[in-house]
Amino acid sequence: MNAIQIKNITKKYNNVTALDNVSFTFEFGKIYGFLGRNGAGKSTLINIIANRIFADNGFVLVDDITVRENMEVHEKIFCMSEVDLYDGDLKIKEHFKWINRFYDSFDLDRALEISKKFNLDTNKKFKALSKGYQSIFKLTVALSLDVPYVIFDEPVLGLDANHRELFYELLIKDYENSERTIIIATHLIEEVANIIEEVVLIDKGKVLIQENVENLLETGYSVSGVAKEVDSYCSNKNVIGYDELGSLKIAYVLGKKTPLPQGSNLQISTMNLQKLFIKLTEKGGKQYE
């Protein structure tokens, strides 16, 4: 099976459970949003996939090959993460040369071309770059590799608005030109909402949702009006959260819409991915059903 399969992964740090029996699949040929608040468990799982740390229980398969201590898998995956794994004293162009030696699929010309688009000075040492330009260097490497699975862990932290827009533009072009799986792990939901096809939402080490974005948004809606009417309409529905202001109330619902009662003053609106994310992960939010 061409996919990254997560099988019953559990990871604990002392008494803290970072991942709690997590199982799901990143299928080949899609753009995923791997969403969750800071500390939800995203980076821990990415580090397990990348073989940087080991799970306490469970395992990861990439194209039916076990990830743990298997060098063959490393040629299939590249993970761009927040962690600085690069020698600070090496110039960017020297890093490119080293990466070119380790990855047969690295396109040096493309890396230099992307560097120019971002105005990344390849003669600078890595440690001399600002936080934003260190991120740009790592993005450039990821976009210049022809591997089946590319994972971006919080890719736009430190980037200004223009650079973020350029990154998403290059990412979409890259996806259109080469068949691969792209996974964007982020808590910045609004920025990726129009890019991703599938969403995996993780919170407190558990997966709340794995769903096609379009299907998910079709089932999510809000009901607003006088609190009594809202409560009556939503009495048998899967309400994932509320907002209240005086006698007015907004209920956020997942599930099939039903007709409003005759003469009702309630309003039904679509719910965006950001609001869905907030309501599912805030204190007291219900799980997706």
Task: State the predicted function of each range.
Residues S81-K138:
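ABC-family P-loop ATPase nucleotide-binding domains
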Residues V150-E154, L159:
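Catalytic Walker B motif of ABC-type/P-loop ATPase nucleotide-binding domains
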Residues G241-E289:
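C-terminal coupling/interaction segments
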Residues G36-G41:
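Walker A (P-loop) phosphate-binding loop of ABC-type ATPase nucleotide-binding domains
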Residues G58-V73:
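Conserved ABC transporter NBD signature motif
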Residues A50:
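Helix-to-loop junction immediately C-terminal to a conserved catalytic motif
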Residues F167-I183, H187-V253:
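ABC transporter nucleotide-binding domain
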